[in-house]
Structures are given as C-alpha cells and as structure tokens.
C-alpha cells in the first residue's frame, strides 16, 4: 500500500500577480526571464536579472490568457518598471493585479498556486519553509543586490541552458561553468552576524536573515568547513554542500 504524501498549505497574502498580455508577450518574456517559454507548459519557475546578473526577483509564472507573474508585493513595482522598459518594443500591456495565492509543500518541494484554499499555515510559515528549502522569495531589501549562486537557488529549477540570450544570461552562464564551486549557501537557526573558521578567522558573506514565528535564521555564502561563533562550533540546519556536493 502506498502512503499518502503530506501536503502543507500556506495562505499567501503578500504576493502580487503581474499580467503580461499581447501578441508578442511570449517574445518579451523570453528575453527577460531565465526559463524557456518555448517549452510549452502552463507553469514556470523563473528568475529575472539585470544586465549585470543581479537577481531582481524570483517568480512563479502561470499561462492563462497571457502570463501571470507571481512575486512578492514589495518587488512587484520594480519588476513592472523593468518589463515596461522593453514592452513598448513588443506591443504588450503590463498590469498589476491582486489575486488569491497560496503555497503548497509536498515531498519537500514548494510551489505557488492561484486560487482560494483553506490553509492552516500563513506567509510567515512559508518564509521559514522557503528559507530551509533554499528558495527564499526575493524581498525589497534583496532585490538587485545578489547573484543567483549567493541565494542558493536550484539552477535546474529556474534556468534553461538551451534557450538563447536573455537578460543576465552571460553572467549566469559564467557562474555556472566556472568549475568546482568554492562557496555555497548554508543556513543556521540563529541570526549570526558573522561566522568564523577553526582558526577564528571571519569567513563567508552574510546574505540575509529571517525572524519569523519567534525563530531566527541566517543565510551565509561560504566555503565548506567547520563553522564557529563565540568559540563554539555551530551546525547549519541546511546547506548546499550536503544537498549536492558536485554543484
């Protein structure tokens, strides 16, 4: 007998859907997002970057009478302004709409969905799940500051290596094909301002921290070693080194 999968449901009230419509909407987004819209699907995970490869936001994109790009409220205007720079060349209409969004966690994988559902978890719970899943949704403070490797995203989930050029593609390709990575993402269940190695030297780069449901987390981009704080060894609650040592 097969066991049923546990599904967690999260009510997400702090998200916006940006609609992109027009006969050339696909062509516009093909040059802006990291996924490949030539792969016919009704849902895409995508990253939008600037020309220097800094991540403007991650997103969930739905195909339904145009394209619905779901992002956090606080980065919605930023992404809209970026897309509108190019929309005049593609005869597209771009608007922002508030629609019901919820999230699901199933078999350790997270996905946003459109619609109303009676969920027993909220946006704060979602933030924690995303933090531990290395898939945190970009907020205003993070937008345009970090590159994709510093955020710990699964590149296979967000990026197509078969499509042609898109904004930030050259930098992403360079980060991907540099060879063996010397730094990856680790997450601690405490808000550390800095971490040290066994020689008491400050190491790594703090990317962001999260306080939610009376819990603290911190996310660092750092080499694979033993980590210390105030002379005591500290253990990450999740990290890329264990998830994929060959990444």
What are these regions (language model features)?
Residues 1-6, 44-58, 200-207:
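Short amphipathic beta-strand starts and helix->beta connectors
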Residues 4-21, 40, 57-137, 239:
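Acidic, low-complexity central loop/insert segments
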Residues 24-29, 76-80, 117-120, 192-198, ...:
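Short, conserved charged micro-motifs
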Residues 25-63:
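A glycine-rich (often HGG/GG-containing) alpha/beta subdomain
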Residues 55, 129, 133-137, 151-158, ...:
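Glycine-rich, small/acidic residue-mixed loop/short-helix segments
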Residues 157, 163-164:
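Residue "hotspots" at secondary-structure boundaries inside conserved domains
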């Amino acid at each position: 007998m097969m066991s049923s999968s546990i599904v967690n449901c999260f009510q997400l009230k702090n998200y916006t859907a940006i609609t992109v419509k027009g006969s050339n909407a696909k062509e516009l987004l093909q040059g802006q997002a990291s996924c490949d819209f030539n792969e016919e699907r009704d849902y895409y995970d995508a990253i939008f970057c600037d020309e220097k490869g800094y991540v403007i936001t991650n997103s969930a994109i739905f195909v339904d009478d145009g394209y619905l790009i779901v992002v956090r409220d606080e980065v919605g205007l930023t992404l809209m302004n970026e897309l509108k720079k190019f929309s005049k060349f593609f005869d597209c209409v771009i608007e922002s709409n508030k629609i019901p969004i919820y999230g699901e966690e199933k078999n350790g994988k997270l996905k946003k969905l459109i619609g109303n559902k009676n969920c027993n978890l909220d946006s704060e719970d979602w933030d924690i799940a995303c933090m531990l899943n290395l898939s945190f949704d970009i907020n205003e403070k993070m937008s345009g500051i970090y590159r994709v490797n510093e955020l710990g995203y699964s590149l296979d989930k967000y990026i197509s290596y078969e499509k042609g050029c898109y904004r930030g593609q050259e930098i992403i390709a360079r980060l991907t094909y540099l060879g063996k990575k010397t730094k990856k993402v680790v997450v601690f269940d405490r808000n550390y301002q800095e971490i040290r190695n066994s020689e008491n030297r400050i190491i790594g780069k703090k990317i962001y921290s999260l306080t939610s449901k009376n819990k603290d987390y911190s996310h660092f981009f750092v080499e694979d070693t033993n980590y210390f704080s105030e002379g005591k060894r500290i253990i990450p609650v999740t990290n890329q080194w264990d998830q994929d040592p060959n990444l």
